[in-house]
Regions:
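Membrane helix-loop-helix hairpins that form the core translocation module of multi-pass transporters
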Residues: 23-26, 30-90
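Transmembrane-helix boundary and interhelical-loop signature of multi-pass inner-membrane proteins
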Residues: 18-32, 50-58, 159-205, 209, ...
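Juxtamembrane boundary at the C-terminal end of a transmembrane helix
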Residues: 191, 236-243
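Alpha-helical transmembrane segments in multi-pass membrane proteins
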Residues: 7-15, 19, 23, 39-40, ...
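Helix-loop-helix junctions within the multi-pass membrane cores of secondary transporters/permeases
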Residues: 109-190
Length: 243
């Protein structure tokens, strides 16, 4: 089951419907309040995911934490070589500029359907939470991250539909395709390849990365989260090697 992705899709569609109905965005004060609440919740669920992945005696917990740190270190090196964060930044910047351009345009200026669709697709799919949440959902059914992403995407869609119309809501299709594929692939790997210890290390690593996303949302620390995404693959690999 792709529970998290279904919740995420519902959030996008609900936000779009509300945006088209109300024809206005939330006030800056309400946006900031929701942003702060989401940041706190993401901190909680991220650290909770890491905490529940740890278990056993002091030596075993130390070993598990060491594996997570090693995975993050190696993962970041791989991510930088693959230029994951730079690519995500470039895509996000392009999408943001497109939205800003049409938001500031005269009322008679209407964007093409594909411009709204592509802009929202990039913003929803290039977010680190898309990969992290979908992977967590597939590895052990932990869909809380995608539920929080559903709120974020829903609020964004409320704003996007006022500029792009219903084409912004159509971005739900690639979101479901991408996140659903990641979740199903993670489910297959978890069921056929990973041991409980390997699953725990991947889940713990994902939890810390989700915590890093909260630091970005709360404007506390600029962390290149996308560069760390390969750590999700390195964590179970290091666990397997360190028997």
């Amino acid at each position: 089951m792709i529970v998290g992705t279904v919740i995420n899709a519902a959030g996008i569609l609900l936000g779009g419907v509300l945006g088209l109905t109300l024809k206005r965005q939330l006030s800056p004060a309400r946006q900031n309040a929701i942003k702060g609440l989401l940041g706190v919740l993401i901190v909680f669920f991220g650290l909770k995911a890491t905490w529940v992945s740890l278990g056993g005696g002091a030596w075993l917990v130390l070993k598990q934490l060491t594996i997570i740190v090693l995975a993050l270190t190696v993962g970041r090196l791989a991510g930088r070589l693959l230029r994951l964060q730079k690519t995500a930044n470039r895509l996000g910047r392009t999408a943001g500029e497109t939205f800003t351009r049409f938001a500031a345009a005269s009322p008679g200026t209407k964007p093409k359907w594909n411009e709204g669709f592509l802009t929202c697709t990039i913003l929803f799919c290039a977010a680190p939470m898309a990969v992290l949440g979908a992977a967590q959902d597939g590895l052990d059914g932990y869909w809380a991250t995608l539920a929080l992403k559903a709120v974020i995407d829903g609020l964004a869609t409320m704003a996007f539909v006022t500029v792009f119309g219903w084409s912004a809501m159509a971005a739900v299709i690639p979101v479901v395709a991408l996140q659903g594929t990641i979740t199903i692939a993670a489910q297959y790997v978890a069921a056929n390849t990973l041991s409980p210890a390997m699953l725990a290390s991947a889940h713990g690593t994902a939890g810390l990365l989700v915590f890093c996303v909260a630091m970005l949302i709360l404007d506390l620390k600029k962390i290149e989260v996308a560069d760390y995404l390969p750590a999700l693959a390195f964590a179970p690999l290091i666990t397997w090697l360190w028997k």
